[in-house]
């Protein structure tokens, strides 16, 4: 009976160890994916901010050019 208990314990132990390793790898992959998503959203925010600023400056420039040409007529 003791042999059966030891064998069962060994089988359970050998099944649990790979599961814990797989869980750890899965968590690491999820963390890497989350970091990549954060980096991409940060880049998108930076690009959209630059485009908004450039659009605002261009709009101001065109507005001032329009007022100059309108004032000369």
Curated annotation (Swiss-Prot):
Coiled-coil annotated spans: none
Signal peptide span: 1-22
BP GO terms, sorted: defense response; killing of cells of another organism
InterPro entries given in the database record: Frog_antimicrobial_propeptide, FSAP
Domain notes: Plasticins have huge conformational plasticity. They can display random coil, alpha-helical, beta-sheet or beta-harpin structures.
Similarity remark: Belongs to the frog skin active peptide (FSAP) family. Plasticin subfamily.
Protein name: Plasticin-A1
